[in-house]
C-alpha cells in the first residue's frame, strides 16, 4: 500500500493548500516563478480551484498522506492538448518537511498512470532546473527520459533559468522503459 494518495483538489482544500504554500514559500520560491502577494490569499485559491473544476485542459491533484489525510503536496497536468498532440505538462511539489520520502516519485507515477489511462494521453513532459537535483531524480526514477536543455526557459526569482526537458510516452510507460 502506498504512503500517499492523489485526489483532485476541491474548493474545500483551499485553506490547507494556502497554509502549505505560505509555510513553504521560501523553499518553493527557489524553484517556481515569482508570485505576486495576491497569489497568497484564500479568496484567490478558492476562486482558482472553483474555475478548474470544469477545465478539461488542467488536472490538479493534492498529494495526501494515506495515514491522516494530510495535504503534503500538489501535482498538476496542465495545458492538456487533444487531437494529434494528446500531451500534458507535468508540475509538482512536495512540502519541504516531507521531502526525501519518495512521495513526489510515487505521485508522478500515479498521475502518469492516470494520464495514459483515464485521460488517454500519449505524452507527458516536464521541465526542471538542472540544479534542482531532487526533482531531476524524481523524473528519472519515475521513468522519464531527458530530451534536452531549454536555455533561459522560465523566469525564476527574477532570473531566466535554463531547464532540462523530460518526457515519457504511453508506449514507453507501458513497456516500463
Go through the PLM ranges and name each one.
Residues 127, 145-163:
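Conserved catalytic-core motifs of GNAT/GCN5-like acyltransferases
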Residues 36, 131, 154:
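Positions that flank functional sites
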Residues 1-97, 160-177:
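GNAT-family acyltransferases
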Residues 11, 15-19, 105-117:
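Amphipathic alpha-helical segments that line or abut small-molecule/effector binding pockets
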Residues 92-94, 100-114, 133-141:
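Conserved acetyl-CoA-binding loop-helix of GNAT-fold acetyltransferases
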Residues 119, 141-142:
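Structural motif
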Residues 118-127:
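Conserved GNAT acetyl-CoA-binding A-motif
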Amino acid at each position: 500500500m502506498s504512503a500517499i494518495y492523489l485526489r483532485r483538489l476541491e474548493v474545500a482544500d483551499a485553506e490547507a493548500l494556502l497554509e502549505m504554500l505560505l509555510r513553504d514559500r521560501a523553499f518553493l520560491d527557489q524553484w517556481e516563478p515569482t508570485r505576486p502577494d495576491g497569489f497568497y490569499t484564500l479568496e484567490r485559491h478558492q476562486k482558482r480551484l472553483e474555475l478548474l473544476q470544469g477545465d478539461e485542459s488542467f488536472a490538479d491533484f493534492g498529494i495526501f498522506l494515506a495515514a491522516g489525510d494530510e495535504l503534503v503536496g500538489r501535482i498538476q497536468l496542465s495545458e492538456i492538448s487533444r487531437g494529434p498532440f494528446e500531451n500534458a505538462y507535468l508540475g509538482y511539489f512536495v512540502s519541504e518537511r516531507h521531502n526525501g520520502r519518495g512521495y513526489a516519485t510515487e505521485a508522478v507515477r500515479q498521475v502518469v498512470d492516470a494520464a495514459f489511462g483515464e485521460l488517454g494521453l500519449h505524452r507527458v513532459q516536464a521541465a526542471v532546473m538542472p540544479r534542482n537535483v531532487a526533482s531531476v531524480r524524481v523524473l528519472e526514477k519515475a521513468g522519464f527520459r531527458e530530451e534536452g536543455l531549454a536555455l533561459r526557459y522560465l523566469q525564476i526569482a527574477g532570473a531566466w533559468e535554463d531547464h532540462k526537458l523530460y518526457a515519457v510516452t504511453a508506449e514507453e510507460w507501458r513497456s516500463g522503459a
